[in-house]
Amino acid sequence: MQQQTKAIVLRTTKYGETSLICTLFTELFGVQSYLLKGVRHVGVKSKTNRAGLLQIGSQLDVVVEHKPNKSLQTIKEFGVAYYYQQVQEHVVANTVALYAIELLLRLLPEASIQTDLFDFTEQFLQTLDATPPNEMGNYPIYFTLSCAAYLGYAIQGVYSEHTPFISISDATFTAYNTGDASLLKTDGVMLLSAIMQCTSMQTLSHIKSNSQTRKEVLDWMLLFLKQHTEHMHTMKSLAIIHSILH
């Protein structure tokens, strides 16, 4: 049965001489792998390579032949749903986008339907595309916190004089500096709490910090996810994020 859905490209792999296998995060079916036959072939009439539309992070409208429990699905049609202005061109925006996509690949199991997380990711990438690069510093932390919350690993509480620490194992702000609550310094705990309370991405730039504190918070968040999920492994894009976002 053919169905139309929105999709975000997570990964592409060459298959044969002219085809691709694409891993897509779809609105209706979660993460699925699709075979696109002949997409790398340059046609005589079009003189274009449609594989160029399938860059990592691309937002698509696709018509798919979906068969439950099949490991490799088939795409019948696809087109661009949103044309980026800077995400695939500007180094800072592209670095943040690639980090977000890699995090999704690490966290999302195949075929797990996550409609709310899909909608959030779609909006995150579009907002990122319209944001000045010098205002993106808190975006990776915000995206990581949001992914954790959508997948059921939300951190409870906020920073206060009564709860100045945060426990990585209990996922909560706490009054006690015991065990793993000392893993994040006070500046980091305050930054994490402030970003958690943001109601929109547009206000993230109002939260002032420095690159070292942001680095410590992002490292802490990834350690948090490693402890609370079975899917997290080393993030290849992490070192690039730290070097690009000052």
Question: Regions from the language model: what does each represent?
Answer:
Residues M1-H246:
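Non-catalytic alpha-helical scaffolds and adjoining flexible linkers that form interface surfaces
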